[in-house]
Amino acid sequence: MATDSASCEPDLSRAPGDAEGATAEAAKKEFDVDTLSKSELRMLLSVMEGELEARDLVIEALRARRKEVFIQERYGRFNLNDPFLALQRDYEAGAGDKEKPVCTNPLSILEAVMAHCRKMQERMSAQLAAAESRQKKLEMEKLQLQALEQEHKKLAAHLEEERGKNKHVVLMLVKECKQLSGKVVEEAQKLEEVMVKLEEEKKKTSELEDQLSAEKQRSAGMEAQLEKQLFEFDTEREQLRAKLTREEAHTTDLKEEIDKMKKMMEQMKKGNDGKPGLSLPRKTKDKRLASISVATEGPVTRSVACQTDVVTESTDPVKKLPLSVPIKPSTGSPLVSTNTKGNVGPSALLIRPGIDRQASHSDLGPSPPTALPSSASRIEENGPSAGNAPDLSNSTPSTPSGTAPAAAQTLGAAPQNHSQAPPVHSLHSPCANTHPGLNPRIQAARFRFQGNANDPDQNGNNTQSPPSRDVSPTSRDNLVAKQLARNTVTQALSRFTSPQAGASSRLGASPGGDAGTCPPVGRTGLKTPGAARVDRGNPPPIPPKKPGLSQTPSPPHPQLRASNAGAKVDNKIVASPPSTLPQGTKVVNEENVPKSSSPQLPPKPSIDLTVASAGCPVSALATSQVGAWPAETPGLNQPACTDSSLVIPTTVAFRSSINPVSASSRSPGASDSLLVTASGWSPSLTPLLMSGGPAPLAGRPTLLQQAAAQGNVTLLSMLLNEEGLDINYCCEDSHSALYSAAKNGHTDCVRLLLNAEARVDAADKNGFTPLCVAAAQGHFECIELLTAYNANINHSAAGGQTPLYLACKTGNKECIKLLLEAGTDRSIKTRDGWTPIHAAVDTGNVDSLKLLMYHRVPAPGNSLSAEEPKSGLFSLNGGESPPGSSKPVVPADLINHADKEGWTAAHIAASKGFKNCLEILCRHGGLEPERRDKCNRTVHDVATDDCKHLLENLNALKIPLRISVGEIQPSNDGSDDFECEHTICTLNIRKQTSWEDFSKAVSQALTNHFQAISSDGCWGLEDGTLNNTTDSCIGLGTSSIQSIMLGSIPWSTGQSFSQSPWDFMKKKKVEQVTVLLSGPQEGCLSSVTYTSMIPLQMLQNYLRLVEQYHNVIFHGPEGSLQDYIANQLALCMKHRQMAAGFPCEIVRAEVDSGFSKEQLVDVFISNACLIPVKQFPVKKKIIVILENLEKSSLSELLGDFLAPLENRSTESPCTFQKGNGTSECYYFHENCFLLGTLAKACLQGSDLLVQQHFRWVQLRWDCEPSQGLLQRFLRRKAVSKFRGQLPAPCDPVCKIVDWVISVWRQLNSCLARLGTPEALLGPKYFLSCPVVPGHAQATVKWMSKLWNAIIAPRVQEAILSRAAMNKQPGARQTASKKHPSQGQQAVVRAALSILLNKAILHGCPLPRTELDQQIADFKGGSFPLSIVSSYSKKKGESAAWRKVNTSPRKKPGHFSSPMWNKPDLKHEGMRNKSVPHLNINRSSSLSKQQSLENDLSMTLTLDHRLSLGSDDEADLVKELQSMCSSKSESDISKIADSREDLRTFDSSRTNPVTSAPVNLRMPVPQKEASPLSSHQTTECSNSKSKTELGVSRVKSFLPVPRSKVAQCSQNTKRSSSSSSNTRQLEINNNSKEENWNVDKHEHVEKRNK
């Protein structure tokens, strides 16, 4: 306690001293509160607050010591132990008022001090508050004065500036007016001159075009004629050259034959008896007829006439030899009529006779000359004639003319043989010398396959056998000599030791000498000399237009004789059924041949053999022969069985290095006659085995090769079953049997040989293995077999060619794929340094190159099918995968590998112009296009023009250029369909591109893009047409750019970096260039223009109106983007004001039906738009947006605000009542802007009172900006979908976009004519149209949803509101909408049907079949023909009613609606109650659409006795009539006349008959209305049956009035109109298909069951 008192006492002692000191100091300074400054007042206030705090502390301390002080004062002087003192205390306590305490009470003193302090505090506070208020008022007045002075100065300066400007402008305008007036006169004169010149130029141009077209036609005709003549000349020249060569060679050979025959005759005279002597000269005579020639060879070629060739007199010995003319294979052609018995099909005739002039028989010199006697007998056409030769009784008989020409067509048929061929030696001609060491087996087998020697021909003459016969007599008198000569055939074996021209097999090559180098394939060339001729009849003559073709027939083929049951081969019976092939020519022996006079084997029965016209050799054993032996070339350049018809060789050709063989190798009894009988004989298949001296006949290895080469599986299997046979035997060219089979693609033979353990890698002399030759020929099945048997897939031939290299040369992708999957090495090089990639590129085969570069080898254990999805990097049919979808498997070293000349694969592709191959190579990241060859040339140096362009763009960076408008905040202003970014093009940035070029490219791309999307012309504008102006018609240009982002790095046009653009983009990894447009945040509207496609000039004009008038309302049809425009303008104004230093705020108020005027007052007051009259206006800018004003009455909502809004000052206040009930005077200040949006096309009623107090901006659908907005918006969307490119006008996307635009325009046009402006639609609802390339159905589906959810309900509501406007005003109008009359329902259905036909479905680019599938999704549009009976009676205007019927020349009867027929009440009453409305919602849709459609369909249940009872309904119907019949309106003037352009739609898919076509051509006059005739009634059944069978008929859904004269026909209550101009089809009411009621689906189901 003592401490507390001690601590408080100094405070009490100091406080009065401080107060006195302050008072004295204040007195000195003449203290005056009014003169104090603000800082001094604040200091005094703080001092006062300190004093008050000190006072509070003192009070608390005194209160705490109060009790102690009281006790001390009262009892401090007494001692409680002293009774005297206690008595004294009590006395004092009980003393009266007169006796006071000894000391004064301190509490009273303290209270007095506190009262005084409190008074002083109140006084000072009042003085301080008055000082502050005065200070505030002073500051405010100062600021206002300063602002007024500044404004005055600005206005004065601005006034002077404007005066000067106006004066200058007036002077300039006067001057310009004078100049322009002069220019107008000059321009008018120039225009007239230019127009005159233009007309002249047009005339000249048209004349030149006519002359040019005529000249083109004439030149085309002359070119065709010239080509035809050149072709004929070439053909004739080749034929004449071949003929001359043949004649020269033939003349020489005939002289040689004469000398040889003389010598032989001398030898024959030395014989023992005369009969053998007779046969020998005849035998030698036959040698004159063996012929070998090549059609295209020069003097080095020598030919010997064949036995079957026609020989004329010695003066012209080879005049009748046929020439080779390529013809098409045809069994009916007289030139190819008898390719029989020799397996020589017409496809041998398809070889072009001049492909390779290197093929020739060049070494015919060593043959000893043989000559024909000059008196050779002449051959008649149909029989023999007596000859002049003493040793011949008859000449060789003739043959049908088709035989010789058919074989003659193969002249030069094997030009692919690049080797020189020696003369063909007679394989069976006899000789005087005998060979003592002849194999006895050959002699024994010689008669095994012989026929009778005395077989007569069809003319009764013995057939002269081919030169392979031992003896060849021609008369019946020499039969014995023939048989005796056969016994001495061994003497002829030694004749082949000397080189001489032999005769080819007769049947194997009909006139073998004219068949080029191809070997014969006939099987009966080794028949006995007396084989019977074929019974072919007289031949047709040769057409005269074939130059050089001999019309004199050659001798026929000898008859093929064999056993019907089978051919006996080495004591084995092998079945030989007759071959039957399509389009074959069946050869049948029709005569029995008399037996020989000497004992011989019995004649063999003939085989009925059909020779296929396709040219395939037919096996007599198992018909397993599948191909022909092509001319062998060491380079493997000729595929045997790929991409061409089978080549059937028809003569013998061997290399010149091979010497003749003995006759025993081809004698009739030789062991290889087994091959002849079994599968046909082709001597060229087996190269001659020995040279010089007598040689044995061909052994089993040779037969094995022949069987493998010809694909004779039966013979091959027989030979492989023999013991001791060397299956790996190789001929002189080192060709094994497996090699031959693989070369010709005989898969079965390859399989047999591999199973027999043939050497799979046996190589020929050039190093080619069977796998190599199979790859070169493209036989992928053989490759698969060989690789399965572990063939060396990386084997290199003599030149380094691997199987993969050869396959790439051929270009067979299956072979390449098999080899790659087998694991072959892609990098093996040839001797010239070429890799398989070089080979693939050299042929220009894109698929081969893709396989080499991208095909991955499947992992072990994975099947090919499992690997396909991973390795299927491209389609082998030519389709390319997108770049970057796969990585190449070949390394860069292989792609860049150079050959001996330094050329890479890219050099080859570029030099040959293979752009596709070069492009694939360029996709490899490691390609080095700058690599130089040994001549210091790069790929670009040797490239063609196309490839140079590709290489120039090779390293170009393709960076997309995008336009960004910033983020679009989600809102209800219609911006949900807007996108933030759009791709406009792709920039190609090359290494040499500079920053200046880059700036120009960006600017040009932006300019082109803006002009392309804003152009009102057609699609597909080129860049060259877009460079006329700097800004587009929507006002955007390069000046609209805010900034450009290179990835994330900002860049501006004209800016340069130290690095080039290519290096910069590469190193910074720039993926796109983004152009940011100036937007509201910058106080501009460019981004708003690009986003909404509203022209920039119009937006700027709207902004000017808002800033100038302060009160603006945007109104137009619903969906005209009013809300979006208002919000964007407000945002732009806000940022402009903020940039100027003024705060700004946007207030949005959404008006609905419950929004009251009081709520609007609260909005205005709370946001300081309305301020009290006594209050000064604020500097803050406030923008109020009232949205959806159409939902409230403008006069009620804004009526009280009109005057204050128009006069914004305190002079025109308005009293408003607040929400709390108080009222006060307010006014609108100048910094408040009011924007409103109204979704109405026009104002009506009391709303017109508001119109004059606001600035109205009307957004009409048929004027800008709405008119072209949709077109520009969808065009930009299409450009973005196509990555910045405008699609072609014929593209389906363009057609579907144009259709959507026309739908919007035609829909609004029809609604405007209908008088329902409240149903008009702005473009907003159509902005969400999906633009999907290749999927037009999605757009039609979207259109159906839009129709069901938006268009149809709005049309229904608008029509019903119009119909009920006058009849049921006020509150009853809503009830009328819910329960419309039947007439109103009919009008609604008619209107929907017309709109769907004329606005929606008209012009849809979908095909009719696809559109029919989509039609059912459009709800509420099925309006069948019906009529209101009372209308015609009431109005008496049936002629006007006729205008509703849009089909021409309609004859109305008693109509009734098949859709709305009310069923019999007795029978269907309960059903009507249970089914209240038609089932229109058949297809699934959104729940909103379903509810809307249900509401719509409930209004469409009609009674069949409906009528139009009101004048308003009649007016609506008249509008519908005029709309349907009028063709004057531009939007609907393109309605098609044909039935296909009008679409069918029905509310029921199961009843397609309840509709009729709508023909919008012309109205029908009243006089044509007549009852339906019975003829028309009959036709309806046909129409019905066709319709039920799926013939889609177009329907008309318009109400048609009943005709009075048709009321009697009660049996025709249904009708269906036709588009015919003369009659109308009517449907009988009696059929169940037409009896429509509410539950029609049940009837349909019953009928279907």
Swiss-Prot record:
Q: Which Pfam families match?
A: AAA_lid_NAV1 (PF25408), Ank (PF00023), Ank_2 (PF12796), CortBP2 (PF09727)
Q: Recorded GO terms, molecular function? A: SH3 domain binding
List the biased-composition ranges (Basic and acidic residues).
1528-1546, 1631-1649
UniProt biased composition (Low complexity): 15-25, 395-416
> Which intervals carry biased composition (Polar residues)?
330-342, 492-503, 1547-1557, 1571-1584, 1621-1630
Tell me, in one coarse class, where this protein mainly resides.
cytoplasm
Record keywords? ANK repeat, Cell projection, Coiled coil, Cytoplasm, Methylation, Phosphoprotein, Repeat, Synapse
Under Gene3D superfamilies, the record lists: Ankyrin repeat-containing domain
Q: Which SUPFAM superfamilies match?
A: Ankyrin repeat
Residues annotated as carrying Phosphoserine in the record are S1510
From which residue to which does any coiled coil extend?
Answer: 118-275
Q: From what superkingdom does this record's organism come?
A: Eukaryota
**Which Cys pairs does UniProt list as disulfide-bonded?**
none
Region (Disordered) spans which residues? 1-27, 322-439, 451-476, 492-604, 1438-1471, 1527-1649
The record ties this protein, via InterPro entries, to:
Ankyrin_rpt, Ankyrin_rpt-contain_sf, Cortactin-binding_p2_N, Dendritic_Spine_Reg/Scaffold
Q: Which GO terms describe its biological process?
A: regulation of modification of postsynaptic actin cytoskeleton; regulation of synapse organization
User: What the protein does?
Assistant: Regulates the dendritic spine distribution of CTTN/cortactin in hippocampal neurons, and thus controls dendritic spinogenesis and dendritic spine maintenance. Associates with the striatin-interacting phosphatase and kinase (STRIPAK) core complex to regulate dendritic spine distribution of the STRIPAK complex in hippocampal neurons.
Name this polypeptide is given: Cortactin-binding protein 2
Species annotation: Rattus norvegicus
- Top-level taxonomy: Eukaryota, Metazoa, Chordata, Craniata, Vertebrata
